[in-house]
């Protein structure tokens, strides 16, 4: 499956549009990570615990979007966009949404 943030794939023809496809993931951040993040916020430095969770969440959202595109018969996704949104009390959860347009391109 080809994924691109552009509205076309160079050298390929969009034969059919299958519609908008999404992948959504909501993950909680545990108190241990919150404690570490608060400490690093005070002392400075990157918060790898949160970064790792974002990487996992983004990959899960993209994979879910791919499955949904395949379910509607698409073999590529164009116009891919990824959004992040804190959720829950004090931002204790993160929502990651991957979206794009499922298309059938010439092989």
Predicted features, each with a name:
Residues 1-33, 71-75, 86, 92-107:
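N-terminal presequence-like segments and the immediate start of the first folded domain
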Residues 21, 26, 34-81:
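Short, well-ordered alpha-helical segments
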Residues 80-88:
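Low-complexity, intrinsically disordered Gly/Pro/Thr-rich segments
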């Amino acid at each position: 499956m080809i994924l691109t943030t552009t509205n076309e794939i160079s050298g390929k023809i969009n034969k059919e549009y299958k519609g908008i496809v999404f992948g959504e993931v909501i993950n909680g951040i545990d108190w241990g990570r919150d404690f570490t993040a608060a400490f690093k916020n005070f002392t400075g430095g990157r918060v790898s615990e949160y970064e790792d969770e974002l990487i996992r969440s983004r990959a899960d959202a993209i994979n879910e979007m791919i499955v949904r595109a395949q379910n509607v018969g698409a073999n590529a996704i164009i116009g891919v966009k990824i959004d992040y949104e804190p959720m829950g009390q004090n931002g204790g959860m993160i929502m990651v949404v991957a979206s794009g347009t499922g298309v059938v391109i010439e092989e």
